[in-house]
Structures are given as C-alpha cells and as structure tokens.
Amino acid sequence: MSLDMQEWREETTAIVNELLADGSNPDLEYEIEHHFACQDFDLLEKAAVDLFKAGFEVTDAEEMELDDGATIFCFDATTECKLDIETIVADIAKMLPILEKYGVDYDGWGTYFQE
C-alpha cells in the first residue's frame, strides 16, 4: 500500500485526463469508487465504519480468493463528484489515515465513462 499522496495525485491526474481525452463529459457528476482490501475482516469492517462516519457511502464486504489461494476481503467507498482532480485527491487524503490506522490497503479508484 502506497501512502505517498504525490503518487495518488499523479495517478488521479492521469485517470481524469484519459477519461476526458476519450470524450467523457466533464460537466456530469461521476460515481467515484475507491477500492480497499485487507486479509483481516474485522479490521476491514472497522475501516468501513470509520469511512462511513467520515461521510462516505460504503458497500458490503466481499470475500475473494487470490491466485496463490490466500483470502482477502474487499469493499468500496463511493462518492459523487465531477471529474475534478483536487476533489478526488482530497477524498483520498481523508481516507488514507483511516486505512493506515487499521492496516487496510487502498487499491485506487475508478469510475465509468459518461458521454
């Protein structure tokens, strides 16, 4: 898990610029899905509760098996906003201390193309 905000800023800038270059509509609100994973369900659940308290919508946790047979638990926290780099980076900055507190990995964010 990288907690370097400069890396997340660069990745966010690249994603937003690619979506806009592909013709995604800059005037619409987008559902931004932030992805999280942890091998310890209890810690993941605590992080989800704290993210909810911080104002994010959270999805139910899912169990996944990795290629090596290990089990991890995952969930998303969602927000709605325009494709605004500063807004998305501010949300990441708000989330990272919560994730660090519980040892939960931040696996980046995504959204869908909109015309």
UniProtKB/Swiss-Prot annotation:
Pfam families: RraB. GO terms for molecular function: endoribonuclease inhibitor activity; enzyme binding. Gene3D superfamilies: RraB-like. GO terms for cellular component: cytoplasm. Its main location: cytoplasm. InterPro entries: RraB, RraB-like_sf, RraB_dom. It is found in: Cytoplasm. The keyword Glycoprotein does not apply. Keywords: Cytoplasm. Globally modulates RNA abundance by binding to RNase E (Rne) and regulating its endonucleolytic activity. Can modulate Rne action in a substrate-dependent manner by altering the composition of the degradosome. Belongs to the RraB family. Interacts with the C-terminal region of Rne. NCBIfam families: PRK11191.1 (NF008393). This is Regulator of ribonuclease activity B. It comes from Aeromonas hydrophila subsp. hydrophila (strain ATCC 7966 / DSM 30187 / BCRC 13018 / CCUG 14551 / JCM 1027 / KCTC 2358 / NCIMB 9240 / NCTC 8049).
